[in-house]
From Swiss-Prot:
Pfam annotation, one family: Pribosyltran
Family label: Belongs to the purine/pyrimidine phosphoribosyltransferase family.
Protein name according to UniProt: Adenine phosphoribosyltransferase
A cellular-component GO term for this protein: cytoplasm
UniProt cross-references to PROSITE patterns, sorted A to Z: PUR_PYR_PR_TRANSFER
Disulphide linkage map: none
Any GO molecular function: adenine binding
Keywords: Cytoplasm, Glycosyltransferase, Purine salvage, Transferase
PANTHER family, per the entry: ADENINE PHOSPHORIBOSYLTRANSFERASE
Described purpose of this protein according to its UniProt entry: Catalyzes a salvage reaction resulting in the formation of AMP, that is energically less costly than de novo synthesis.
UniProt xrefs under InterPro entries: Ade_phspho_trans, PRibTrfase_dom, PRTase-like, UPRTase/APRTase
Length: 177
């Protein structure tokens, strides 16, 4: 599947020493976007994984998670940056590859025991994914799996998530480049 070749690499963004993997070139291409959603849909249908809802991490996790929610017939729950959700929220701070941030989820976003597929575009340090998983768990959900378009194995996020007991699935890896 030619997904990797559709992802643009931008050196020294957002700061020097970071190689940014830009999926906008992938998702603006209707064939590339369809490949991503079709592949993920097929993977989860064939795996028979038991989950109730998809949680997408702002912002690119909304794009993939929303489309995947539609194709799989699942609800969608957003994890957002602070101040973007209108009702009561819980927050989680986290470290990322180039700084720190905070994310939030509505306190009533999930029903106790709901199984969640957590979706984002890219896995680097695992900080964002761990923070989102903590939010899911704070509001009563269970993370069934985490799905990403891009994994950067050299940065160590996948290893960190696996060590914490999370299942991880990604479409493509950028190793050593």
């Amino acid at each position: 599947m030619p997904i990797k070749s559709r992802i643009r690499s931008i050196p020294d963004y957002p700061k020097k020493g970071i190689m940014f993997r830009d999926i906008t070139t992938l998702i603006k291409d209707p064939v590339g976007f369809r490949l991503v959603i079709d592949h993920l849909t097929q993977h989860y249908l064939e795996a028979g994984m038991d989950f109730d809802v998809i949680v997408g991490i702002e912002a690119r996790g909304f794009i993939i998670g929303g489309a995947l929610s539609y194709t799989l017939g699942k609800g969608f729950v957003p994890v957002r940056k602070p101040g973007k959700l209108p009702a009561d929220v819980v927050s989680q701070e986290y470290e990322l590859e180039y700084g720190s941030d905070k994310i939030e989820i509505h306190t009533d976003a999930l029903v106790e025991g709901q199984r969640v597929l957590l979706v984002d575009d890219l896995l680097a340090t695992g900080g964002t994914a761990l923070a989102a998983a903590a939010l899911v768990e704070k509001v009563g959900g269970i993370v069934a799996e985490m799905a990403f378009i891009v994994n950067l194995p050299d940065v160590g996020g996948e290893r960190k998530l696996l060590e914490k007991g999370y299942n991880v699935y990604s479409l493509t890896d950028f190793e050593g480049d």
